Amino acid sequence: AFELTQTPASVEAAVGGTVTINCQASESISNWLAWYQQKPGQPXKLLIYKASTLASGVSSRFKGSGSGTQFTLTISDLECADAATYYCQSTD
């Protein structure tokens, strides 16, 4: 069965720092991957689609990269407001 594996499970970082979240697909999905941000009590927010395309209104501090089976979300210049759950999702 198709699976997406995200690492690390959790991360701590300082304001102004950078974090990287990885997503590995069990089979190639080309660039059909999206990244979402989820905060408690709020709907999920689309950050990145097609692996690297920034969604409308999303800060350029968020960067998506990768293709095939390996993908990365990088958040730079961290702000307190970035505290959230982030997840990847296949859009194929």
UniProtKB/Swiss-Prot annotation:
Residues 1-23 are annotated as: Framework-1. One of its GO terms (biological process) is adaptive immune response. Residues 57-88 are annotated as: Framework-3. Residues 24-34 are annotated as: Complementarity-determining-1. This is Ig kappa chain V region 3381. Residues 89-92 are annotated as: Complementarity-determining-3. This chain was obtained from antibody to type III pneumococci and was isolated from the serum of a single rabbit. GO terms for cellular component: immunoglobulin complex. The keyword rRNA-binding does not apply. InterPro entries: Ig-like_dom, Ig-like_dom_sf, Ig-like_fold, Ig_V-set, IgV_Light_Chain. It holds the Pfam family V-set. Residues 50-56 are annotated as: Complementarity-determining-2. Residues 35-49 are annotated as: Framework-2. Keywords: Adaptive immunity, Immunity, Immunoglobulin. The keyword Transmembrane does not apply. It comes from Oryctolagus cuniculus.
